[in-house]
């Protein structure tokens, strides 16, 4: 039986101001707050785009962890990475180099007079992901990553050799990944040392060491989403651990990744601690997030079991550097943690998706064996980063559906939970003014085979005695979820503030609700998930009196785009006034054109040639489904989307046009699976919201609603006049 769970007094009219696409895109975007060793100040970066100047600005700021007061540190856009050396000294990467075109530099600055810092080292290329520790000797040991040649030297784009031909030649896959054609360069972690000179200033001591190049075909961080969480440096400065996809198996067919351990000075060949022959046996999936304990004696990391499944459950493992023994923790815990931090030598905090939120969990290492279930430290919001501030307190950075950024102080005592909210974006940013927890609630309802969760997001001035058209949003993945978190791309509140009640379900295949729900989508893309969505729509129709399903619209991206295409040829498709597909698959046989072959082979239980019927079982392009197409349909597909190539969107548009279904095709030649450029994002929002508003009637009801005509880009239409 379904139930509506109000997170606050949403029955009262919301005081929120309407969140427009322009406000969403131009609102400040902030990084995690990183505390100094004493835990009284944190540093974070911010960036902001202006539609007046059509430029972005960036800055670094300080957050007082007692008062929540924010003060500027620097607005120098060349400052790209900052780490604390002590309570009052910062080490950072300067993105320019006066002597080396395309190079960068390491600088040291004091907190009280940041502009008076000095250059400590020259770097031969563009570097990112700085991590550093100060050893007992006073030396600074650091690591960062850059592109590399196979000979171990750093790749500098401005100094690189160019060829007269544009040809690309491949003898193996990948050919391209995400939005990039592979080349002979790769990501690599480099290590270096800074020593104090006789003038009490730090300076480079020796050349950088490439810690990845000694392993043929290794790469760290691993693209497209790898970053500094793919590696770590021990507190004593002696060791570096990094993740790399396994170089001994075909990377396009496996998710297998190893954690390599190597001396910081590169004096020994990196060793894969969980490579072939290591214990526990049979654990061969993706590895990530290596983190050293504060005493440098242990290394925690996450690993999946299945070498072909990107959404397998992650388990925490502890590697003892002395004995080389590996111990799994909380193996019966039905969650999949994605981040780890040690608070002391015997305690770990893990972050994990958890029923539509991102919560933190406390794990005492010695007690967390067997069927141990961790206790929650947070509950309800989405914690994206966390650091030990001092004593028993964490500094937690995250977001919610109504706030793009918050920083909380959270106790390591589960009974205390959140001690204090220091700052929240919706309380300090004019663009988000008035947004709050009253804008959202959630529902649980009976799905195809189990209870299903969905978020409900309300429009500006919501009054439950009135009715609002339904905006039905379908997430991608397919192993993904709608969370109580902010998005600058698919933001439910922006949809809601056009005048909709947004319902965002987490059907079969969604993550954060246990393995069984996540795994049940395998070879079942148009089965149980579709039935869950039908039941979600029916629950809304029958139970939420303030929602007008007769004027409903639906939209989805990636797998959500596939589902919208599937809905177009299904009974549910006739219940919507308009549909939007963003980068969705349409033709079953086209799945072989993707890059990560292990994904499709796992989802459909075999290769394209061995189990072709599995690939075609839920085919939106089947003739009998095409004959049912009738609902006006907007298609977005981008040229740099190599996961689902642009031909998928063009194929769907061709069919809709020939069938006479009102349709439009939106294409960005310089965007990938996502739309991230601010100006492109504005057009995306204008077209998506304008399309939905046109057919739902919102455009007639709300004079401030976005319309298709808001876009200044000309529309190509060479059809003869009707």
Curated annotation (Swiss-Prot):
Active site: 558 (charge relay system), 641 (charge relay system), 673 (charge relay system)
Claim: Membrane is one of the keywords in the record: no
Pfam families in the record: Peptidase_S9
Keyword Hydrolase annotated: yes
EC number: 3.4.14.-
Gene Ontology biological process terms in this record: proteolysis
Subcellular locations according to the entry: Secreted
Keywords per UniProt: Aminopeptidase, Glycoprotein, Hydrolase, Protease, Secreted, Serine protease, Signal
GO cellular component: extracellular region
Superkingdom of the source species: Eukaryota
Molecular function per GO: aminopeptidase activity; serine-type endopeptidase activity
Enzymatic class: hydrolase
Signal sequence residues: 1-18
Positions bearing carbohydrate: 75, 78, 86, 94, 151, 253, 448, 605
Family, as annotated: Belongs to the peptidase S9C family.
PANTHER family assigned to the protein according to its UniProt record, in alphabetical order: DIPEPTIDYL-PEPTIDASE 5-RELATED, SERINE PEPTIDASE S9 FAMILY MEMBER
Function comment: Extracellular dipeptidyl-peptidase which removes N-terminal dipeptides sequentially from polypeptides having unsubstituted N-termini.
Protein name stated in the entry: Probable dipeptidyl-peptidase 5
């Amino acid at each position: 039986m379904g139930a509506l769970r109000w997170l606050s007094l949403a029955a009262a009219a919301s005081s929120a101001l309407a969140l427009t696409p322009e406000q969403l895109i131009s609102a400040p975007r902030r990084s995690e707050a990183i505390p100094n060793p004493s835990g009284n100040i944190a540093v974070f970066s911010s960036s902001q785009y202006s539609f007046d100047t059509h430029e972005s600005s960036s800055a670094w700021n300080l957050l007082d962890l007692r008062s929540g007061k924010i003060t500027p540190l620097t607005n120098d856009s060349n400052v790209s990475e900052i780490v604390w050396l002590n309570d009052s000294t910062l080490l950072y990467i300067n993105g320019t180099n006066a002597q080396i075109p395309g190079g960068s530099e390491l600088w040291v600055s004091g907190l009280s007079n940041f502009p008076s810092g000095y250059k400590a080292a020259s770097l031969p290329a563009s570097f990112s992901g700085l991590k550093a520790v100060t050893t007992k000797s006073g030396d600074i040991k650091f690591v960062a990553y850059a592109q590399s040649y196979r000979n171990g030297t750093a790749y500098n784009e401005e100094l690189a050799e160019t060829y007269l031909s544009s040809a690309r030649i491949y003898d193996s896959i990948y050919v391209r990944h995400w939005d990039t054609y592979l080349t002979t360069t790769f990501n690599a972690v480099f290590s270096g040392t800074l020593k104090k000179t006789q003038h009490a200033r730090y300076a480079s001591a020796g050349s950088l060491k490439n810690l990845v190049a000694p392993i043929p075909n290794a790469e760290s961080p691993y693209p497209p989403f790898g970053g500094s969480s793919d590696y770590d440096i021990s507190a004593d400065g002696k060791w570096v651990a990094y993740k790399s996809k396994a170089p001994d198996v075909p990377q396009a067919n496996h998710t297998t990744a190893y954690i390599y351990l190597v001396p910081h000075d590169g004096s020994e060949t990196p060793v894969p601690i969980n490579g072939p022959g290591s214990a526990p046996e049979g654990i061969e999936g993706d590895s990530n997030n290596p983190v050293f304990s504060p005493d440098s004696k242990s290394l925690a990391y996450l690993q999946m079991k299945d070498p072909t499944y990107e959404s397998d459950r992650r388990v925490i493992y502890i590697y003892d550097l002395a004995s080389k023994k590996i111990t799994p923790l909380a193996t019966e815990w039905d969650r999949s943690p994605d981040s780890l931090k040690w608070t002391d030598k015997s305690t770990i905090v893990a972050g994990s998706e958890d029923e539509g939120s991102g919560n933190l969990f406390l794990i005492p290492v010695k007690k967390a064996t067997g069927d141990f279930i961790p206790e929650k430290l947070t509950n309800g919001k989405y914690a994206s980063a966390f650091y030990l501030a001092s004593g028993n307190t964490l500094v937690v950075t995250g977001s919610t559906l109504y706030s793009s950024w918050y920083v909380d102080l959270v106790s390591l005592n589960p009974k205390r939970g959140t001690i204090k909210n220091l700052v929240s974006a919706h309380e300090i940013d004019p663009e988000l003014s008035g947004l709050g927890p009253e804008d959202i609630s959630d529902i649980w309802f009976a799905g195809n085979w189990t209870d299903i969760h969905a978020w409900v997001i309300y429009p500006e001035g919501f009054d439950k005695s009135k009715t609002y058209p339904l905006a039905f949003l379908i997430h991608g993945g397919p192993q993904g979820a709608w969370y109580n978190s902010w998005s600058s791309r698919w933001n439910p509140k922006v949809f809601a503030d056009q005048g909709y009640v947004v319902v965002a379900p987490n059907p079969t295949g969604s993550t954060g609700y246990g393995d069984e729900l996540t795994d049940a989508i395998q070879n079942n893309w148009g089965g149980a998930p579709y039935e869950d969505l039908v039941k979600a729509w029916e629950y809304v129709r029958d139970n939420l009196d303030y929602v007008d399903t007769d004027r409903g619209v639906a939209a989805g991206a990636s797998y959500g785009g596939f589902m919208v295409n599937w809905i177009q040829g299904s009974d549910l498709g006739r219940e919507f006034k308009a549909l939007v597909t963003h980068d969705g698959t349409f033709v079953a046989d086209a799945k072989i054109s993707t890059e990560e072959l292990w994904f499709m082979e796992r989802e459909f239980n075999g290769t394209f040639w061995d189990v072709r019927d599995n690939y075609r079982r839920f085919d939106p392009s089947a003739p009998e489904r095409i004959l049912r197409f009738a609902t006006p349909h907007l298609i977005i597909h981008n040229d740099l989307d190599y996961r689902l190539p642009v031909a998928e969107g063009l194929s769907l548009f061709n069919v809709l046009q020939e069938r006479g279904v009102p349709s439009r095709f939106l294409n960005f030649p310089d965007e990938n699976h996502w739309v991230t450029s601010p100006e492109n994002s504005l057009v995306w929002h204008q077209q998506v919201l304008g399309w939905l508003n046109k057919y739902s009637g919102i455009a007639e009801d709300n004079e401030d609603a976005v319309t298709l005509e808001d876009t200044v880009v000309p529309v190509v239409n060479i059809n003869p006049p009707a």
